C-alpha cells in the first residue's frame, strides 16, 4: 500500500480504500480513495506492508504511527496460508514534525526513474536556521522558566530513548509474525471448533496473543466492516516451517550447514521417500509481558510472566496433526532483584495472599485446556527451593483432580552437561504423553483431540524449559509419524530430519530467550546438536553476563515500551534511569574493584585457614576449573582458588551457593610434573580462552591434572598472560626447592583427569575443624547429593530424655558432635538431624537463604550434651562417629540409594517399591524394641514401644492438612513433646499417630520385575535395622499382641518392617517421624526408569501430654476444611 504525506494527515491507500491519520490529534479515519484529491499537497513517500498501530510514548507527547516497512516470508502453512515475519518498521510522528529518513521502498507509479522519494521538508541547513529563529523568537517573547525548559528537554530525550528501544524491539529481535489469511493466535484444535464462524480474522483471534490489540484499538472501535482490511493481528513469538524427507539412506549435512541454519534438502525425485511438513509456532501472551527481572510470577488477575504457547504442526498429505505445550513463570508472587549477578529469588506475598491469584490462573488454564500436567524443573535444593516449595504447596491447596504435578530437578539429573538424561523424564511420563493424545484433522473434520496440556517451567522458563519441551514434542512427533505410516515402527527419526528438528527447537528457544532475557538461550548447543560441548558452556557464561548487564538499565526502557504497547501504566520512574545510566560506568568500575577486594579477602582468609604455620604464602588467584568432567550443569563452571606456598599448592573449590570454600586439595610441589598452557580444548569453533593444565602425580601414579583458566577482565582478553605469570610463579617456587618443572605451550587435548583423591572437606564454622573425605566428586557432581540431603533424619533418641529441662518455648538445640546435629524445629514438632557437611559438601549452618533450615535462632550447648549423656550413650555416640555413610546400587534398576544412617529414626521412602493395591496393615515387630543400653527409661514402660493409636485417615489431603495445622496451631507442642519424653518413666504413656496414604497407579506386583526385598547393608553392631518390603500375608501372619496395635494404613499395600538381624542393638521404628509432607515412592520398571506415583506421607504425631480430645477436634476441623487431595504428585 502507498503512504502519502499531506499537510495535516498521513494517508495510507490501497485500491479503493484509504486510511487517514491526523497529524494534529492522532485520530484515524476511513475514507474513500478519491478523497486523496482533497488533501493539501499530498506526496507519496513510498510503499508499506501494513499497519501495526499507534503508540504514545508520553502523555505530553504526540502519538506515533507504526507501519510494517519490510516483511520476510517464513513459509506456507497447510491450506497455502503465507506466514510473514516483520523485519523492519517505519515510525511516523502524528504531529507537525517532519518525518525522518524512512527508507521506504519507492512507489513505481509515483517515483518512476527516481532513486529517492521527493520530500516537502526543507534542507537540513534551512531546518536548523528556521528552528533557531523560532527558538529565539519564542525566548524573546516570553522568557520561559528554566525548569520548564529542562523538563521539556528531558521529555524529548526520554522519547528518543524509548523510540530507539521500540525500533530495536521490532527490527533486531525479529520476533513479530502475522498472516493475512491464517489465525496464528489459535491452535488447530481451537480453530477446528469454530470453522463455521463467519467473522473476520481479527475478531476470531485469541485475545491472549493478539499483541497489537491495544495499539490498533482506534481502528477496532470504528466498528464498520470496512475496517477489517486494515487490522492485522500480530503475534510475538516464533514461527519456523520446514519440509522434511524421510530418507534413511542420506547422511547428515553437518559439514555443509551451520548450526543456526538447517541443511537445505535437495529436490527428491524419488516418491518412495515420504515428505512431511513441520511447523513450530510459539505465541507469547500479551498479559504480564515484559523482561526477565521486571516481570516474574503471577499478577492479581492470574496472569503469569513469560507465558508462551508452543504448537508443533505435522502435515502429511491432507492430514494435519497438532500438539501444543505451554510455559509460564511459577504462579506465585515472587521476584528477583536484577542488580546482582544471579540474584536470589524471594517471595513477595504470603501464602494466603497468593491462593486466589494461583486459583485464577489455573482455573483459566483448565477452562481452555481441560487438563494440566505441570512439569516443574526448578532445583529442589539451593536458592530455587523456596520457589519450588511454594509452588507445590499451592498445588496441594488448589487440590484439583485435573492437575498432575511432576517435579524433575533438571540440574540434579543432568549434572556434568549430561542433558541427554532428559530422556529419564520423558520415559517416566511416557504414559501421560500417550494418554494426552494430540489433535488430528483431515478434510472430513476432526479425528481426535488433544486432552490436556503440558505446562513446563523452570525459573526463567527459557533454557531448561526449551530442552524439556523439545524432548516431549519429539516423542509425540515420532508417535504421530508412525501412526501415519511415514516412519517405520522400530526406526528412529532419520539423521537429517533429526538435525533439522533440533535446529528448529533451538531457534525457538533463542527467540523466546531474546524476547524475555535479551540474549540467546543457554544450552542451545544441546538442543541444536543433541550434545553438550565445552564451547557451549563457555558461550553460556558470556550470555549469562550479558543478561546481567541488560537487566540493569536497558531492560527498564524495553519494559516501559512493552507496557506502553499494551496500555499498561508505566510504574517505574523513567527519568531516574537517566541518572542511573550515567552512574552505570562508575558503578561498574566500583563493582570490579569490589570484586577484586572480595577475591583478596577470600585469598587472605583461606590462606590463614588452609596453610599450616610452617608454610609461607607466595600467591593466590581466582580461577575457573574448566575440566569437562567437573563442570557443574547448574552453574556451568566451577570457581576455584589457587593458593601457592613454599611447599605446596592448594586447589580450593568455591561454592557460590553459600559463598564459601567447602572442599580443597593440597598438592606438594614435588608432585607437580609439568605445566601446559594453550587454547581451550574444543570440538568445534575457535577457542575463546587459554587454559593451564597442571599435571601432578598421586601415590606415584600419573594421569591427574587440573585444567584452569583465568577470568578475563575484558571480552578481548583470553587470560593467557595471567596463566603465564602463574606458571612462572609455580616454576620459580619449585626451583627454590632444588627441583624444576617444565612449562609447555601447546594445544590442550580434550580429556578428563582421573578422579582426584585426598579431597579435604571444610566443616561448618561452628566446628572450626577440617575433616578429610574421599567422596568429593560424588557429593558435588552426582545426582545422589540432593537425595542424601533430603533424606537426612538421624537422631540419637537416647540423648533426648533430659531435654525437658528447657524452658524456652521456641528454640533449636544443636549438639555439636563431629558428625551429628540435633535440631528442635520451631514450626515442626519433630526432632531431626543433619549430617556433617564435611564429606557430602553440605552448606554451612546459618546460610543466608535458609536452604537447609528455615529457623533463625539456635541454642548450642556442649556442656548440656556432656552432662546429659550416660556412659552407654557415650559409647553409642562414639560408634556413630566411627561409621560413615555407605551408598549402594539396586541392581534391578540401576538407581543409587543411600544407606540408612546410624541412629536414624526414619528412612526415605523413595527407595521402597510399592506395587500392590490391596490395603494392608504394617506392624513393627520385635525388632522395634529399644536396644540394650537405651532401654532405661523408655523401655521401663511396658507399652512404650507397642501402644500406638490407629488413625483412620484415608485421604492424602487429610494427612497433609494434619501436618500443617499442627505446625501452625501447636508451636508449643515441641516443648511439651520433649518434656513428655523426659517424663516417660513416671507417666508410662507414649502414643504416636502415624498416618500415611498412598495413591498408586502401578501394575500388580506379579507383573513388576523382581528386585531385592531388603537392602542387606553390612554395618557395625550398633547400627539400626533396615527397612524391608514384604508381602502382605507375611506381615499379617507375624502380628503379635504386642505389635498388633502399631498399625500403618497404606492403600497400595506397603508393608514395612524392621529387620531382626540387629535386634541386640537399639531398633528404630520405621514409622518414626518423617518431616517432609510429601514423600515420593517410585515404581521402577525393567529399564530402570521412574514412573512416578504420588504418596502423601505426613506426620501426625501428637504429644503424649496433649489431651486426645483436642487432637480429635483438630482432625475434624481439617476434614471439614479440606477434601481429598486429588492432584497427582510425581517426583522423578
Curated annotation (Swiss-Prot):
This is Phosphatidylinositide phosphatase SAC2. Residues 250-269, 833-872, 908-951, 981-1016 are annotated as: Disordered. Residues 908-918, 994-1005 have a biased composition (Polar residues). Homodimer. Interacts with OCRL and RAB5. Interacts with INPP5B and INPP4A. Interacts with STAT3; the interaction is independent of STAT3 'Tyr-705' phosphorylation status. Residues 857-872 have a biased composition (Basic and acidic residues). Inositol 4-phosphatase which mainly acts on phosphatidylinositol 4-phosphate. May be functionally linked to OCRL, which converts phosphatidylinositol 4,5-bisphosphate to phosphatidylinositol, for a sequential dephosphorylation of phosphatidylinositol 4,5-bisphosphate at the 5 and 4 position of inositol, thus playing an important role in the endocytic recycling. Regulator of TF:TFRC and integrins recycling pathway, is also involved in cell migration mechanisms. Modulates AKT/GSK3B pathway by decreasing AKT and GSK3B phosphorylation. Signal peptide: none annotated. Residues 167-518 form the SAC domain. InterPro entries: hSac2 (IPR034753), Inositol_phosphatase (IPR022158), SAC_dom (IPR002013). It is found in: Membrane, Clathrin-coated pit; Early endosome; Recycling endosome. PROSITE patterns: HSAC2, SAC. It comes from Mus musculus.
Amino acid at each position: 500500500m502507498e503512504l502519502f504525506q499531506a499537510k495535516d494527515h498521513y494517508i495510507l491507500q490501497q485500491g479503493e480504500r484509504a486510511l487517514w491519520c491526523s497529524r494534529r490529534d492522532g485520530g484515524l479515519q476511513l475514507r474513500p480513495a478519491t478523497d486523496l484529491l482533497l488533501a493539501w499537497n499530498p506526496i507519496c513517500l513510498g510503499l508499506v506492508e501494513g499497519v501495526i498501530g499507534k503508540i504514545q510514548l508520553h502523555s505530553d507527547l504526540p502519538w506515533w504511527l507504526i507501519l510494517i516497512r519490510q516483511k520476510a516470508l517464513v513459509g506456507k502453512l497447510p491450506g497455502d496460508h503465507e506466514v510473514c515475519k516483520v523485519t523492519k518498521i517505519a515510525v511516523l510522528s502524528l504531529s507537525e514534525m517532519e518525518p525522518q529518513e524512512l527508507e521506504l521502498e519507492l512507489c513505481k507509479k509515483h517515483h518512476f526513474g527516481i532513486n529517492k522519494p521527493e520530500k516537502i521538508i526543507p534542507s537540513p541547513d534551512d531546518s536548523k536556521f528556521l528552528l533557531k529563529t523560532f527558538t529565539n523568537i519564542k525566548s524573546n517573547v516570553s522568557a520561559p522558566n528554566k525548569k520548564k525548559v529542562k523538563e521539556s528537554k528531558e521529555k524529548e530525550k526520554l522519547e528518543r530513548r524509548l523510540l530507539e528501544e521500540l525500533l530495536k524491539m521490532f527490527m533486531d529481535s525479529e520476533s513479530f509474525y502475522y498472516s493475512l489469511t491464517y489465525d496464528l493466535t489459535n491452535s488447530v484444535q481451537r480453530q477446528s471448533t469454530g470453522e463455521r464462524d463467519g467473522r473476520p480474522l481479527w475478531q476470531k483471534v485469541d485475545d491472549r496473543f493478539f499483541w497489537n490489540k491495544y495499539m490498533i484499538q482506534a481502528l477496532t472501535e470504528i466498528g464498520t466492516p470496512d475496517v477489517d482490511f486494515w487490522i492485522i493481528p500480530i503475534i510475538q513469538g516464533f514461527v519456523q516451517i520446514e519440509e522434511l524427507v524421510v530418507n534413511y539412506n542420506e547422511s547428515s549435512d553437518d559439514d555443509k550447514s551451520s548450526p543456526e541454519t538447517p541443511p537445505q534438502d535437495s529436490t527428491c525425485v524419488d516418491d518412495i521417500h515420504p515428505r512431511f511438513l513441520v511447523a513450530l509456532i510459539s505465541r507469547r501472551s500479551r498479559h504480564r509481558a515484559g523482561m526477565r527481572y521486571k516481570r516474574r510470577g503471577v499478577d492479581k488477575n492470574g496472569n503469569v510472566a513469560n507465558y508462551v504457547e508452543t504448537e508443533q504442526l505435522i502435515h502429511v498429505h491432507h492430514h494435519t496433526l497438532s500438539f501444543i505445550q505451554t510455559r509460564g513463570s511459577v504462579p506465585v508472587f515472587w521476584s528477583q532483584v536484577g542488580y546482582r549477578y544471579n540474584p536470589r529469588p524471594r517471595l513477595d506475598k504470603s501464602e494466603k495472599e497468593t491462593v486466589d491469584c494461583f486459583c485464577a490462573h489455573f482455573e483459566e488454564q483448565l477452562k481452555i485446556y481441560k487438563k494440566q500436567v505441570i512439569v516443574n524443573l526448578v532445583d529442589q535444593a539451593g536458592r530455587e527451593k523456596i520457589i519450588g516449595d511454594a509452588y507445590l504447596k499451592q498445588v496441594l491447596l488448589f487440590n484439583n483432580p485435573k492437575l498432575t504435578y511432576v517435579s524433575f530437578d533438571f540440574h540434579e539429573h543432568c549434572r556434568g552437561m549430561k542433558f541427554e538424561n532428559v530422556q529419564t523424564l520423558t520415559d517416566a511420563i511416557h504414559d501421560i504423553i500417550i494418554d494426552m493424545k494430540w489433535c488430528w484433522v483431515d478434510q472430513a473434520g476432526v479425528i481426535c483431540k488433544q486432552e490436556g496440556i503440558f505446562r513446563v517451567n523452570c525459573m526463567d522458563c527459557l533454557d531448561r524449559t526449551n530442552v524439556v519441551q523439545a524432548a516431549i514434542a519429539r516423542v509425540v512427533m515420532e508417535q504421530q509419524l508412525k501412526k501415519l505410516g511415514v516412519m517405520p515402527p522400530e526406526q528412529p527419526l532419520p539423521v537429517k530430519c533429526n538435525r533439522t528438528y533440533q535446529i528448529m527447537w533451538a531457534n525457538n528457544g533463542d527467540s523466546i530467550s531474546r524476547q524475555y532475557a535479551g540474549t540467546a538461550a543457554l544450552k542451545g548447543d544441546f538442543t541444536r546438536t543433541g550434545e553438550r560441548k565445552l564451547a557451549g558452556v563457555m558461550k553460556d557464561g558470556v550470555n549469562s553476563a550479558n543478561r546481567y548487564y541488560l537487566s540493569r538499565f536497558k531492560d527498564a526502557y524495553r519494559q516501559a515500551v512493552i507496557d506502553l504497547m499494551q496500555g499498561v501504566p508505566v510504574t517505574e520512574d523513567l527519568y531516574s534511569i537517566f541518572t542511573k545510566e550515567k552512574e552505570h560506568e562508575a558503578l561498574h568500575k566500583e563493582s570490579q574493584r569490589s570484586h577484586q577486594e572480595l577475591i583478596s579477602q577470600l585469598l587472605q582468609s583461606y590462606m590463614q585457614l588452609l596453610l599450616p604455620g610452617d608454610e609461607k604464602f607466595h600467591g593466590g588467584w581466582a580461577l575457573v576449573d574448566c575440566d569437562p568432567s567437573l563442570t557443574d550443569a547448574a552453574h556451568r563452571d566451577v570457581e576455584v582458588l589457587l593458593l601457592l606456598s613454599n611447599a605446596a599448592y592448594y586447589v580450593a573449590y568455591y561454592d557460590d551457593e553459600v559463598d564459601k570454600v567447602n572442599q580443597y586439595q593440597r598438592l606438594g610441589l614435588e608432585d607437580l610434573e609439568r605445566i601446559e598452557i594453550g587454547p581451550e580444548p574444543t570440538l568445534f569453533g575457535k577457542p575463546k580462552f587459554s587454559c593451564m593444565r597442571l599435571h601432578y602425580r598421586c601415590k606415584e601414579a600419573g594421569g591427574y591434572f587440573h585444567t584452569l583458566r583465568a577470568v578475563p577482565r575484558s571480552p578481548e582478553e583470553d587470560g593467557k598472560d595471567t596463566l603465564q605469570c602463574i606458571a612462572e610463579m609455580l616454576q620459580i617456587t619449585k626451583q627454590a626447592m632444588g627441583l624444576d618443572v617444565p612449562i609447555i605451550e601447546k594445544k590442550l587435548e580434550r580429556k578428563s583427569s582421573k578422579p582426584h583423591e585426598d579431597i579435604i572437606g571444610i566443616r561448618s564454622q561452628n566446628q572450626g575443624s577440617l575433616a578429610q573425605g574421599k567422596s568429593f566428586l560424588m557429593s558435588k557432581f552426582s545426582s545422589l547429593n540432593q537425595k542424601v540431603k533430603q533424606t537426612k533424619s538421624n537422631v540419637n533418641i537416647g540423648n533426648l530424655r533430659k531435654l525437658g529441662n528447657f524452658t524456652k518455648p521456641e528454640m533449636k538445640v544443636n549438639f555439636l558432635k563431629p558428625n551429628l546435629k540435633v535440631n528442635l524445629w520451631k514450626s515442626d514438632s519433630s526432632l531431626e538431624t543433619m549430617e556433617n557437611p564435611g564429606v557430602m559438601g553440605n552448606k554451612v549452618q546459618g546460610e543466608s537463604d535458609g536452604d537447609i533450615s528455615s529457623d533463625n535462632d539456635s541454642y548450642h550447648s556442649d556442656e548440656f550434651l556432656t552432662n546429659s549423656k550416660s556412659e552407654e550413650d557415650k559409647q553409642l555416640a562414639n560408634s556413630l562417629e566411627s561409621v560413615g555413610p555407605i551408598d549402594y546400587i539396586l541392581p534391578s534398576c540401576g538407581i543409587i540409594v543411600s544407606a540408612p544412617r546410624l541412629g536414624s529414626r526414619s528412612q526415605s521412602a523413595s527407595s521402597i517399591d510399592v506395587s500392590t493395591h490391596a490395603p494392608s496393615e504394617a506392624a513393627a515387630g520385635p525388632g522395634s524394641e529399644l536396644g540394650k543400653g537405651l532401654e532405661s527409661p523408655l523401655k521401663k514402660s511396658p507399652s512404650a514401644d507397642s501402644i500406638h493409636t490407629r488413625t483412620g485417615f484415608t485421604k492424602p489431603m487429610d494427612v497433609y492438612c494434619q501436618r500443617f495445622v499442627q505446625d501452625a496451631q501447636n508451636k508449643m507442642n515441641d516443648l511439651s513433646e520433649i518434656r513428655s519424653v523426659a517424663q516417660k518413666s513416671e507417666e508410662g504413656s507414649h502414643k504416636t499417630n502415624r498416618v500415611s496414604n498412598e495413591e498408586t497407579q502401578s501394575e500388580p506386583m506379579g507383573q513388576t520385575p523382581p528386585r531385592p526385598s531388603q537392602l542387606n547393608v553390612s554395618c557395625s553392631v550398633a547400627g539400626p535395622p533396615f527397612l524391608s518390603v514384604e508381602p502382605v500375608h507375611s506381615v499379617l501372619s507375624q502380628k503379635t499382641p504386642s505389635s498388633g496395635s502399631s498399625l500403618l494404613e497404606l492403600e497400595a499395600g506397603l508393608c514395612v518392617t524392621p529387620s531382626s538381624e540387629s535386634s541386640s542393638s537399639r531398633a528404630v521404628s520405621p514409622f518414626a517421624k518423617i518431616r517432609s509432607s510429601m514423600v515420593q515412592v517410585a515404581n521402577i520398571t525393567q529399564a530402570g526408569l521412574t514412573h512416578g506415583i504420588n504418596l502423601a506421607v505426613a506426620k501426625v504425631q501428637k504429644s503424649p501430654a496433649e489431651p486426645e480430645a483436642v487432637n480429635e477436634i483438630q482432625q475434624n476441623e481439617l476434614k471439614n476444611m479440606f477434601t481429598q487431595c486429588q492432584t497427582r504428585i510425581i517426583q522423578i
